[in-house]
Amino acid sequence: MLKPLCVVIGTTGAGKSDLAVQLAKRFGSQVINADSMQIYRGFDTITNKITVEEQENVHHRLMSFLNFDKEYSVPEFERDASRVIDEIHSQGKIPIVVGGTHYYLQSLLFEDTTLSAIDKLTNDSSPSKPPHPDSHILDDDPSAMLSYLKKIDPVMAEQWHPRDTRKIRRSLEIYFHTGRPPSEIYSEQKMKSSGSKLRYKSLIFWAFADSLVLMPRLDKRVDKMLSHGLVDEIKSMKSLAESEKFSPDFTRGIWQCIGFKEFMPWFEAPSDIVFNDCLERMKVSTRQYAKSQKKWIQSRFLPMCLAQQDLSPSSILFSTTNTTDLNNWEEQVEKACRVFQYFFYNGDAIAPSADDQHAFEKARDYLSIMNGRQSQKKKFVCEECLDKRGDPFTVIGEDAFNVHIKSRKHKTTVRRKKERAERQIRLKNIGILK
């Protein structure tokens, strides 16, 4: 019989931490952090940790324990979270896991997921094994890493955007650890994980807010962070990096947190104009992160949950918590508590709400195409358009490319190029241009 586990997911700023606290208070439990930035000791403001006051005397685990110069893998989280969950179960309580690092949660909930299995594969390499002779490429620039990946695994290279440094490096790490093309390993693990099993009897709450409300809310939160010592923390992080005499990698460890890299231009050219520009960049990055989290939930996490629900309805339940209107917060908390009570103690489930049904419908669409065409993983380059850096515009997936081709931006670019070419021909015809 599966032991119970409650999980609260959601985008940044949607109120998932507050919901987890209220559930823990109501049912006398503890909260386990599943945010990859909040595991680090210190830097409470830039990583948006819940304050001591906001915790309301609820014990929070796996938070603020890792030193800034360390990294924390998926298998390490899986191991530590499982240990804490067992400990809470031994006290007769139902653990509540909360966080926005969804690959942590996916690995914890489901056995043999692709991400978890591949991380274990690379972590299990013998310490005495000599490094790969080409592993120095991991410290090179993204274009060099991508060129190397194209040589050893062109299939994998086609799936990553040229500027997705983290994924390109990860693919190379897999190759250097295993000696095999990462696409081959991903394919094998995907076949194995297609039948992934639940580890726990799982109740999953998705705290969400309408984008028109969430985005301004996120902007205000960044402004609030500014008044709570954000700049001092960024200065402290920069000083730590300088004291250790290394250049921070913005794609790894604590250095990934939103705000650090965005404010680097201000240190190089301090002025009010540059500061305000950096602040705006941080707000944009925060909004983009929220969008990517929502996409992950809708297209990956929720479909996996629904697939399991189809197999075993009594083992997993997905429920939404709408935080758009904070005037209805107490009502939403009460709804979540009723769902918790019915699912874990009454052995039943409350009928899905309208928000639940809407989420399920979108997830069903994603579920039907989850293992769809390879063209959705292929890289497409537009020969007409340039991105913000002046590089050829690149997207992943045929559908995304078709959307771009039909966009006003693409059509305008093509029209202007055509008009310029026609103008040059006319000028040549009248002898102005040779």
Swiss-Prot record:
<comment type="similarity">
    <text>Belongs to the IPP transferase family.</text>
</comment>
<feature type="region of interest" description="Interaction with substrate tRNA">
    <location>
        <begin position="256"/>
        <end position="258"/>
    </location>
</feature>
<dbReference type="GO" id="GO:0005730">
    <property type="term" value="C:nucleolus"/>
</dbReference>
<feature type="region of interest" description="Interaction with substrate tRNA">
    <location>
        <begin position="291"/>
        <end position="298"/>
    </location>
</feature>
<dbReference type="GO" id="GO:0052381">
    <property type="term" value="F:tRNA dimethylallyltransferase activity"/>
</dbReference>
<keyword id="KW-0819">tRNA processing</keyword>
<dbReference type="InterPro" id="IPR039657">
    <property type="entry name" value="Dimethylallyltransferase"/>
</dbReference>
<feature type="binding site">
    <location>
        <begin position="10"/>
        <end position="17"/>
    </location>
    <ligand>
        <name>ATP</name>
    </ligand>
</feature>
<dbReference type="GO" id="GO:0005829">
    <property type="term" value="C:cytosol"/>
</dbReference>
<feature type="region of interest" description="Interaction with isopentenylpyrophosphate transferase">
    <location>
        <begin position="211"/>
        <end position="233"/>
    </location>
</feature>
<keyword id="KW-0963">Cytoplasm</keyword>
<keyword id="KW-0067">ATP-binding</keyword>
<keyword id="KW-0547">Nucleotide-binding</keyword>
<dbReference type="GO" id="GO:0005524">
    <property type="term" value="F:ATP binding"/>
</dbReference>
<feature type="region of interest" description="Interaction with substrate tRNA">
    <location>
        <begin position="281"/>
        <end position="299"/>
    </location>
</feature>
<dbReference type="InterPro" id="IPR027417">
    <property type="entry name" value="P-loop_NTPase"/>
</dbReference>
<keyword id="KW-0863">Zinc-finger</keyword>
<comment type="function">
    <text>Catalyzes the transfer of a dimethylallyl group onto the adenine at position 37 of both cytosolic and mitochondrial tRNAs, leading to the formation of N6-(dimethylallyl)adenosine (i(6)A).</text>
</comment>
<dbReference type="GO" id="GO:0005739">
    <property type="term" value="C:mitochondrion"/>
</dbReference>
<dbReference type="GO" id="GO:0006400">
    <property type="term" value="P:tRNA modification"/>
</dbReference>
<feature type="region of interest" description="Interaction with substrate tRNA">
    <location>
        <begin position="35"/>
        <end position="38"/>
    </location>
</feature>
<keyword id="KW-0539">Nucleus</keyword>
<keyword id="KW-0808">Transferase</keyword>
<keyword id="KW-0862">Zinc</keyword>
<feature type="site" description="Interaction with substrate tRNA">
    <location>
        <position position="189"/>
    </location>
</feature>
<feature type="zinc finger region" description="Matrin-type">
    <location>
        <begin position="380"/>
        <end position="416"/>
    </location>
</feature>
<protein>
    <recommendedName>
        <fullName>tRNA dimethylallyltransferase</fullName>
        <ecNumber>2.5.1.75</ecNumber>
    </recommendedName>
</protein>
<dbReference type="Pfam" id="PF01715">
    <property type="entry name" value="IPPT"/>
</dbReference>
<feature type="binding site">
    <location>
        <begin position="12"/>
        <end position="17"/>
    </location>
    <ligand>
        <name>substrate</name>
    </ligand>
</feature>
<keyword id="KW-0479">Metal-binding</keyword>
<feature type="region of interest" description="Interaction with substrate tRNA">
    <location>
        <begin position="166"/>
        <end position="170"/>
    </location>
</feature>
<feature type="site" description="Interaction with substrate tRNA">
    <location>
        <position position="101"/>
    </location>
</feature>
<dbReference type="InterPro" id="IPR018022">
    <property type="entry name" value="IPT"/>
</dbReference>
<keyword id="KW-0496">Mitochondrion</keyword>
<dbReference type="GO" id="GO:0008270">
    <property type="term" value="F:zinc ion binding"/>
</dbReference>
